[in-house]
């Protein structure tokens, strides 16, 4: 397998702690425990009998780990691994002799689909087959619409076009994309798999099917918002003079509400003037019938006055154009007579009639029988407000009549004596059917109608002319998947007829019973070939084609130039990353052993707030040449800690970030060093503490930071197996502590010098700032060591050193 490597380089040296000597370290592999006479410090020994790994230190072989480990519980099945890198290309083989072409075999019976054959080499282009003849087009007879029939029998299969002449079998080509699914023919003898034919023409568009039966009236929709104000109606004829009623105050004309869903039928009021018919909207939900204005309180019936002149009837509004009639819904059951509806919005005041003669006061008439409530007329559109008429003479106050039924609120006239309720006007002529009212709220979607019987399987559409046999084998661009052919002998599905115009939406009645399935529409004539449709759904999987003949073996390539003789070294390469942040790397091909070296981020030197010096930062924990067994392709995950920020006059030094590494089941944590405090601040002048190290072999604690005001000096880092903890940073005028032979940062003890940074396992700590004889600013740490502390000259400490990760790979 080949792997792509990043950040690999040739073997480079790693600075050793001064306390170790690992020059020319070796790895021994043998059976049994090693003898201390064998090898030198720094060597490794693998006992193949027990898989124990030993490391020689101070002349003694020390057991550090067992590579086998106890069998763990069966893990959860992992996700499929990514494809491995492509292997190296083998040498080209010799070209084989080309076999002579065999005779075509007899056509055999169609067998079961075989397994997919191996992809062959691209074969030679086969000869084009003859184009088959186009089959005859079947006639589509339109029958009369009858009752919904059962799904018809499957139509006869149209005649297949002539089969193209079989071309010579070419060498097996690369496996092509699945071709369009052709019409399934009658299963015949297994033929030679032909090449994909040209896409047949799309059938002609079918005739529009007969209109389906009217659905059952849906439930009444909810009352809609009040509709928009309509145009002013034509002036009506002058009616008989009514008795002067008490003239009410002119009310404000209410805004016409938005049309809402259809409300419950109220009591049918007197028929109003027919308003202009509005333009037919798209059939929508029945809007709410315009809300009637608020019902006024019934006033005391005034004395019957003389009948005043009836105001001139407004001109009748022009009848609007009749909208297209929608499909009528089934007439719903007549609803119960509803409560009298609220009084509608006040219409515009009609032209003032001429003043009538004052009549004699009449005797109080008997209360007439209440007339039967007339059918409620269609509510006309609200007319424009007419000019106010002249005030008539006040008639003599008549006897108070019985309270009549509240009529629809008329136009407010001038206040006269309240007259007896006028006779109910004749029912107006029924207005022309307005455009079908907006359909009430759309009823819940009815059960999906049975799928219209699939048009009788149309006569099998003309079979597309058998395409010329394409070049066999060459993998063409994947063709557009054709329209999915009807399975089996079914004729090609005709184009879906264009959607019929939506009829005006009828009033939504109560949800009716599921209607009978509509009659199947006559299959329309085949339309002209349409533009290429969108890619159709994937057709049924075709029969497995015959395995093509394996191509000839390619010619053997020229031998490559002989490479230079390599050195016999097990070293493969080194991976290094010293940029803070997270990353991954992959164990390279051939590697079975590796050494890990890494460091966390060092702590930053402190700040200063007065003339005293400030402490240094602590160093991070480190790992040095930790031995590992690895496998090619293993992913190593890591996070590199950054060095702590330098202190300022108002802020202490920042702590270094932790470095973590995960290699298989092994985890390493290298804690960053602590930041130095702020000089001159009580309780905050201590040096930063060193970071600890945790490996599979245990935890090594870090050194403590120096304590200000004459407290304890900083603690040195500790040495563990392949691990060095960070040393503590020194307080003001104190050197930082050391680790593994690397000293801490130095300070100028004769002045108010800054404390030195702690040392890491790979570098000395940053020196503190000095003032005499010249001012030298505090130094930053490197490779995880701590930064030096400042004096009051700069007041800012050195930054902590960033961490890093390094892996050296070996094949043996």
Swiss-Prot record:
<keyword id="KW-0176">Collagen</keyword>
<dbReference type="GO" id="GO:0044423">
    <property type="term" value="C:virion component"/>
</dbReference>
<feature type="glycosylation site" description="N-linked (GlcNAc...) asparagine; by host">
    <location>
        <position position="667"/>
    </location>
</feature>
<comment type="function">
    <text>May participate in the formation of a layer of cross-linked glycosylated fibrils at the viral surface thus giving it a hairy-like appearance.</text>
</comment>
<feature type="compositionally biased region" description="Gly residues">
    <location>
        <begin position="752"/>
        <end position="765"/>
    </location>
</feature>
<feature type="domain" description="Collagen-like 2">
    <location>
        <begin position="143"/>
        <end position="502"/>
    </location>
</feature>
<feature type="region of interest" description="Disordered">
    <location>
        <begin position="71"/>
        <end position="568"/>
    </location>
</feature>
<keyword id="KW-0379">Hydroxylation</keyword>
<feature type="compositionally biased region" description="Basic and acidic residues">
    <location>
        <begin position="444"/>
        <end position="523"/>
    </location>
</feature>
<dbReference type="GO" id="GO:0030198">
    <property type="term" value="P:extracellular matrix organization"/>
</dbReference>
<feature type="glycosylation site" description="N-linked (GlcNAc...) asparagine; by host">
    <location>
        <position position="13"/>
    </location>
</feature>
<feature type="compositionally biased region" description="Basic and acidic residues">
    <location>
        <begin position="531"/>
        <end position="561"/>
    </location>
</feature>
<feature type="glycosylation site" description="N-linked (GlcNAc...) asparagine; by host">
    <location>
        <position position="637"/>
    </location>
</feature>
<feature type="domain" description="Collagen-like 1">
    <location>
        <begin position="69"/>
        <end position="128"/>
    </location>
</feature>
<feature type="compositionally biased region" description="Basic and acidic residues">
    <location>
        <begin position="121"/>
        <end position="435"/>
    </location>
</feature>
<feature type="compositionally biased region" description="Basic and acidic residues">
    <location>
        <begin position="88"/>
        <end position="112"/>
    </location>
</feature>
<keyword id="KW-0946">Virion</keyword>
<dbReference type="InterPro" id="IPR050149">
    <property type="entry name" value="Collagen_superfamily"/>
</dbReference>
<dbReference type="GO" id="GO:0030020">
    <property type="term" value="F:extracellular matrix structural constituent conferring tensile strength"/>
</dbReference>
<dbReference type="GO" id="GO:0005615">
    <property type="term" value="C:extracellular space"/>
</dbReference>
<dbReference type="Pfam" id="PF01391">
    <property type="entry name" value="Collagen"/>
</dbReference>
<feature type="glycosylation site" description="N-linked (GlcNAc...) asparagine; by host">
    <location>
        <position position="502"/>
    </location>
</feature>
<keyword id="KW-0677">Repeat</keyword>
<feature type="glycosylation site" description="N-linked (GlcNAc...) asparagine; by host">
    <location>
        <position position="658"/>
    </location>
</feature>
<feature type="glycosylation site" description="N-linked (GlcNAc...) asparagine; by host">
    <location>
        <position position="83"/>
    </location>
</feature>
<feature type="region of interest" description="Disordered">
    <location>
        <begin position="730"/>
        <end position="802"/>
    </location>
</feature>
<feature type="domain" description="Collagen-like 3">
    <location>
        <begin position="506"/>
        <end position="565"/>
    </location>
</feature>
<dbReference type="InterPro" id="IPR008160">
    <property type="entry name" value="Collagen"/>
</dbReference>
<keyword id="KW-0325">Glycoprotein</keyword>
<protein>
    <recommendedName>
        <fullName>Collagen-like protein 5</fullName>
    </recommendedName>
</protein>
């Amino acid at each position: 397998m080949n792997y792509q490597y990043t950040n690999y380089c040739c073997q480079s040296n790693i600075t050793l702690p001064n306390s170790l000597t690992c020059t020319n370290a070796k790895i021994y592999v043998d059976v049994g425990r090693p003898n201390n006479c064998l090898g030198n410090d720094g060597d490794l020994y693998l006992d193949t009998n027990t898989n124990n790994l030993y490391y020689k230190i101070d002349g003694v072989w020390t057991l550090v780990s067992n590579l086998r480990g106890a069998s763990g519980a069966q893990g959860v099945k992992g996700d499929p691994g990514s494809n491995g890198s492509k292997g190296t290309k083998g040498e080209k083989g010799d070209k084989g002799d080309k076999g002579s072409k065999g005779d075509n075999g007899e056509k055999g019976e169609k067998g079961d689909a075989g397994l997919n054959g191996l992809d062959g080499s691209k074969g030679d282009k086969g000869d084009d087959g003859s184009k088959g003849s186009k089959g005859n087009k079947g006639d589509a007879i339109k029958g009369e619409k009858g009752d919904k029939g059962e799904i018809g029998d499957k139509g006869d299969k149209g005649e297949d076009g002539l089969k193209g002449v079989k071309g010579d079998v070419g060498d097996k080509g690369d496996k092509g994309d699945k071709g369009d699914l052709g019409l399934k023919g009658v299963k015949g003898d297994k033929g030679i798999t032909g090449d994909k034919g040209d896409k047949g023409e799309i059938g002609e568009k079918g005739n529009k099917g007969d209109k389906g039966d009217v659905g059952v009236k849906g439930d009444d929709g909810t009352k809609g918002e009040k509709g928009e104000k309509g145009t002013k109606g034509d002036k009506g004829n002058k009616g008989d003079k009514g008795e002067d009623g008490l003239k009410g105050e002119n009310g404000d004309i209410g805004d016409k509400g938005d049309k809402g869903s259809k409300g419950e039928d109220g009591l049918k009021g007197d028929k109003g003037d027919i308003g202009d018919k509005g333009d037919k909207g798209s059939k929508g939900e029945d809007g709410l019938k315009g809300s009637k204005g608020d019902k006024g309180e019934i006033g005391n019936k005034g004395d019957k006055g003389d009948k005043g002149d009836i105001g001139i009837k407004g001109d009748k509004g022009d009848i609007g154009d009749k909208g297209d009639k929608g499909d009528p819904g089934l007439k719903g059951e007549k609803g119960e007579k509803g409560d009298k509806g609220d009084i509608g919005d006040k219409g515009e005041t009609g032209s003032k009639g001429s003043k009538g003669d004052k009549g004699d006061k009449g005797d109080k008439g008997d209360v007439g029988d209440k007339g039967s409530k007339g059918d409620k007329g269609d509510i006309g559109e609200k007319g424009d407000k007419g000019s106010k008429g002249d005030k008539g003479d006040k008639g003599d106050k008549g006897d108070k009549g019985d309270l009549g039924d509240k009529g629809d609120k008329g136009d407010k006239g001038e206040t006269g004596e309240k007259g007896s309720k006028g006779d109910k006007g004749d029912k107006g002529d029924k207005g022309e059917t307005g455009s079908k009212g907006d359909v009430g709220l759309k009823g819940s979607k009815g059960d999906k109608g049975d799928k219209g019987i699939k048009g009788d399987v149309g006569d099998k559409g003309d079979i597309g002319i058998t395409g010329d046999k394409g070049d066999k084998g060459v993998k063409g661009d994947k063709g557009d998947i054709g329209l999915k052919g009807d399975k089996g002998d079914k004729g090609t599905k005709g184009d879906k007829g264009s959607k019929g115009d939506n009829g005006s939406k009828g009033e939504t009645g109560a949800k009716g019973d599921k209607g009978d399935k509509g009659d199947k529409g006559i299959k329309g004539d085949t339309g002209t070939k349409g533009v290429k449709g969108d890619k159709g759904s994937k057709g049924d999987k075709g029969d497995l084609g015959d395995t093509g003949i394996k191509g000839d073996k390619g010619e053997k390539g020229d031998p490559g130039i002989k490479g230079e003789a390599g050195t016999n070294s097990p070293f493969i390469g080194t991976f290094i990353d010293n940029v803070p942040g997270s990353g991954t790397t992959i164990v390279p091909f051939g590697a079975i052993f590796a050494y890990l070296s890494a460091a966390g981020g060092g702590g930053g030197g402190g700040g200063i707030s007065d003339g005293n010096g400030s402490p240094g930062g602590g160093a991070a924990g480190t790992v040095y040449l930790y031995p590992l067994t690895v496998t090619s392709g293993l992913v190593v995950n890591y996070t590199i800690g950054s060095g702590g920020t330098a202190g300022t006059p108002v802020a202490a030094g920042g702590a270094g970030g932790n470095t973590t590494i995960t290699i298989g089941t092994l985890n390493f944590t290298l804690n960053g060093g602590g930041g130095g405090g702020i000089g001159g601040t009580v309780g905050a002048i201590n040096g930063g503490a060193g970071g600890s190290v945790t490996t599979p072999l245990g935890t090594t604690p870090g050194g403590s930071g120096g304590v200000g005001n004459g407290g304890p000096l900083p603690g040195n880092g500790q040495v563990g197996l392949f691990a060095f903890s960070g040393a503590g940073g020194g307080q003001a005028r104190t050197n930082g502590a050391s680790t593994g032979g690397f000293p801490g940062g130095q300070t100028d003890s004769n002045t108010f010098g800054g404390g030195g940074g702690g040392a890491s396992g790979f570098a000395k700590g940053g020196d503190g700032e000095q003032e005499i004889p010249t001012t030298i600013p505090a130094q930053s740490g490197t490779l995880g060591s701590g930064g030096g502390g400042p004096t009051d000259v700069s007041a800012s400490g050195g930054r902590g050193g960033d961490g890093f990760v390094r892996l050296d790979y070996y094949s043996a």
